[in-house]
Amino acid sequence: MSGVQICRKERYEEMNELIHDTTLYEDIPPSEGRLPREMAVYGLLKELGISYQRLDHEPMATIEDCQGVDELLGIHMCKNLFLCNSQKTVFYLLMMPGEKKFKTKELSHQIGSARLSFASEEFMEEFLHIQPGAVSVMGLMNDGENRVNLLIDEDVLKEEYLGCHPCVNTVSLRLKTEDVIRKFLPYVKHGYTSVHLTGE
């Protein structure tokens, strides 16, 4: 067996440990055993007429865990970073391709905010009603005071579809990028800033 075949076999085995049901669902699941924050996402998507494909899986805390999800949904899951300035007075949600490296200096220069850092779990829960590992653009539906500024890497905007969690990291969604931009964001009263990140 070649080295490439071994790597593929190991990745498939890891995927099976995290994804027991490979069915892609397109309807709202029963609420039993699911958090209200997750069900609220499905309710809003239905209200806005936004279709999606849903994949249930074990908790996935990192973008590396999501490789199997990428393959099954035919998308690239977004890397979502919750950031703040040094004074912890301005907050950002950054959506970028999972394979890109995040360089603080590169982003800081573009948005005019020096010394960016990762915001705390407490702010994440307060503003987005999300816990670490489940950060998602869907969390903006909970940011009624517009405390969080959305930043989207231009490569994410170029894709027809994007992948995100519905505020929990046990489910992944495939959504049309245009639906998120033209339907979801206006409804939750959030704009966005396009950024150019090279990861270099």
Regions found by a protein language model. Name each.
Residues 6-200:
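Extended, low-hydrophobicity, polar/charged segments
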